[in-house]
Amino acid sequence: METTQKPKEIIGHLMVLSTIVIYSFNTNFMKILMPEWIDPHGLVLIRCTVMAFGFWIISLFIPANKQQAKPKRKDIFMMMLGGLLGIGGNLLLYINGLNITGPVDAFVIRTVQPIIVIALAVLILHADFNRYKAIGIVLGLAGTLYVSITPHAGAVKDSFTGDVLIFVASVFNALYLILIKPYTQKFNSVIVMRWMSLAAFILVLPFGLHQALKAPLFTSEAPVHICLELGFVLILATMIAYFLNLKALLYISPFVESVYIYLLPITGAIVSISLGLQKFSWHDPIALVLIIAGFALINKKKKVKVVINKS
């Protein structure tokens, strides 16, 4: 049993690592696309439209024996709630935040997500809580606050507001990871994505329709590199990355999956600086150290005293 479980865990880890590489480029490509070629809500709508149509079409070709259990109304409602939090709400907040802050800041703030997962587990699932977890959560939040209030170099419109939006998006995503985990065990991943993406599409449609229709991306001739970057965002970052993240929950826990986000500030910053989208700043590594220190404290295990009876 253990030997078969290990390869499956490795598959889960590889899936999440793949999404980290995709997201490192995706955030930077979205920064290039916005707002010159398309506004934030318009980009979110296009992503959710591609996702919804894509997964509904794919689901039609899944054999009945591969679909596992048939979702009940309550299951569909919970999966759609997951879509509202983890796709629609998360993307609306994150992409609007990214539009007015730097990509490196976005990567650093996203690293607070494992801490949020633990904090929510304490609040919702009544997980164990101690002073180390309390100090760790405070340190993680301090790191997020530090990167948000420090001055920024480069063309950043309203970094603080953007950083706050990205933080709230991380809360939405953490809630989604906790909520959707049981449904990845019960139903085929494509079926789960089908209902989640439909809910996300319904949520973002009224926000993004006007922006999508008037976007220069579609009303004027866009350069080849812009079209390729859009293709990357829509196919790799929207369809494939979301599917891999969901599929990985079959093999690893939401907590383990969220830990991989600590790689993002490194891989993402390399891409950001290479593309000239943000200059290197010492504020970001300092904030990252605070967040990682908080994470380490949260995971500090209590020492168990062993009492030896000599009688």
Task: Please annotate each region the language model reported.
Residues 10-15, 41-61, 81, 136-142, ...:
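Hydrophobic alpha-helical transmembrane segments of multi-pass integral membrane proteins
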Residues 24, 56, 83-88, 92, ...:
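Hydrophobic/small/kink-forming positions within alpha-helical transmembrane segments
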Residues 22, 27, 56-104, 109, ...:
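Specific transmembrane alpha-helical segments of multi-pass solute transporters/efflux pumps
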Residues 55, 120, 129-151, 204, ...:
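Hydrophobic transmembrane alpha-helices of multi-pass small-molecule transport proteins
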Residues 33, 43, 47, 97, ...:
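Hydrophobic/aromatic residues within transmembrane alpha-helices
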Residues 29-40, 67, 99, 148-159, ...:
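Membrane-interface helix termini and inter-helical loops of multi-pass transporters
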Residues 46, 87, 91, 105-112, ...:
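Helix-helix packing/entry segments at the starts of transmembrane helices
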Residues 1-46, 155-182, 202-206, 309-311:
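Glycine-/small-residue-enriched transmembrane alpha-helix faces in small-molecule transporters
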